[in-house]
Amino acid sequence: MQADAGSNLLRNWIARAAAATPDKPWVVSAEDGRTITYRQLHGTVARFATFLSERGLGPNDRVALLANNSVEQLLCYLGVMAAGATICTVHVEMNRNQLDNIFERLKPKLIIYQDGLQLDDMLQNAQAPKLRLGRWDRSEPDTLFAKVLGRAPSLQPDKSETGAGPNDDAVILFTSGTSAKPKGVVLSYREFLLNIDPLAAGWGITAADRLYDFRPFSWNSAQTLSALGVVNRGATLILAEKFSASRFFQHLRDHGATIATGNPTTINILLNSGQTAHHDDLPNLRFMTSSSAPLLLGDWKRFEQKFGIPVAQGCGTSEVGWIAACPGEQRRLGSVGRPFAYLDLAVVDTNGTRLPPGEIGHVELGGWPDLAFRYLGEDGEIKIHSRGRLRTGDLGSLDADGFLTLSGREKELIIRGGAKISPVEIDSFLMQHGDVIEAATVGVPDAIYGEEVVSYVVTRPGAATDAGALLEYCAALPAFKAPKRILLADALPKTERGKLDRKALAERWKSDFQSRPTESDEHQTRGNPGRAI
């Protein structure tokens, strides 16, 4: 473990890149080409240290940032963290009640927000000084960048005796989901920054790479891979404001991207978007990543066949960061790659005993004795949920070569008459049907078996396949795994991170069908599939 994993570690990465390639682009806007070099990043970070120090902000002082993807957002993010304060990224699509709850708990010393997002009214109840983000390349009075760039840089921009230490808080990340009270995940500088070198090595990132990302930078995965991983390697980030199927391949082509990020939802959208791009037209592109949820094998194969672009899968958690990754050249279909050695990942049974290769069990992490899952409590204090060896909530298996394959989330398992069924397995089977473009399986109440298997399916526009035909198709599954009802849907609910929202589907089922729970008689359940959403 690195001796100094505080804020100075990040400052040293920036200084190293600025010294080696001062005029190299650190970040480029995919939309308008605006560029910030490593020399400019280095100088601005030094001015952030002066600005925050003058306001009396230091280690563990919380700075909230509400902004969409932009070069200014990332510059502010790195500036606050490199100065040693605690950056708290908040998704701009939170509702008023969620924001009120967040700021009541967070008690930030400063709130920075993007203008033009109608946030002024939403932030009225927040008891903290507020600053508009502004533009880095344009003089706009009373904005953050007008104030930061007007400061002289700190005298020793790469070494600060007042910087944050390894155990000080680096980031607080807020989930959105469907809860009225978003969960605040707290990571120390040690926990956060020690993830960066392994993930950069795990994905095979080099200084020559130009990484393209569109994902919201309120996510841990985007922050660590695309903001910090790029700086760690002295690479270049091509930053898009948001995902656009119509512009995705054009962005990759125009900016010479070598790595493109993605997730199962965007891969599915691209598959069904009518885009005709091919890897032959993108000679610089090495591979595309997928994370946030297991990528169904059918989608994985279809994407590579249609576009000729290798897909490499990785995984992680908000509480730790990236756990496993694999460069496109070494990928294995279905796997999320090799776990990072420092996290000492194991697959264990319910008693904590390590399982042999190929057996499915609980994914558990270790690495160092004080590893902990920490959350922001209702009173604003940090609560330790668990410490030591920690279970992520994922189910998976390791093969003989150490590659990890995830089978789903433990809390999403369907338990039918004592038999445990992975909904991902059923989804994957349904997705192999030629007319199915999305599928999500959930467990619903059943008077006899406790839970029964129900699948929601989106079919291709104009497809003649109905729910009855899909039930017949599923007869090839073992009888206890086969859905007892299939409901056609126009779309499936997703979380902010693009994951299937099975909880929302289960709640929809309860609302629509709780008064008449499923029966185990196959004839009755096949009689009226309906359309649920």
Tell me the role of every PLM-derived stretch.
Residues 193-210, 217-259, 273-274:
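Conserved AMP-binding/adenylation subdomain of ANL enzymes
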Residues 477-500, 522-523, 527-530:
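AMP-binding/adenylate-forming catalytic domain of the ANL superfamily
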Residues 66, 356-358, 364-424, 431-432, ...:
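Conserved ATP-binding/catalytic segment of the ANL
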Residues 232, 257-262, 273-332, 344:
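Gly/Ser/Thr-rich phosphate-binding loop
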Residues 94, 111-113, 260, 395-482, ...:
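AMP-binding/adenylate-forming catalytic core of the ANL superfamily
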Residues 26-70, 74-78, 95-100, 104, ...:
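Conserved AMP-binding/adenylate-forming core of the ANL superfamily
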Residues 116-166, 274:
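ANL superfamily adenylate-forming
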Residues 5-7, 22-25, 137, 152-174, ...:
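Conserved pre-ATP/AMP-binding loop-to-beta segment of ANL
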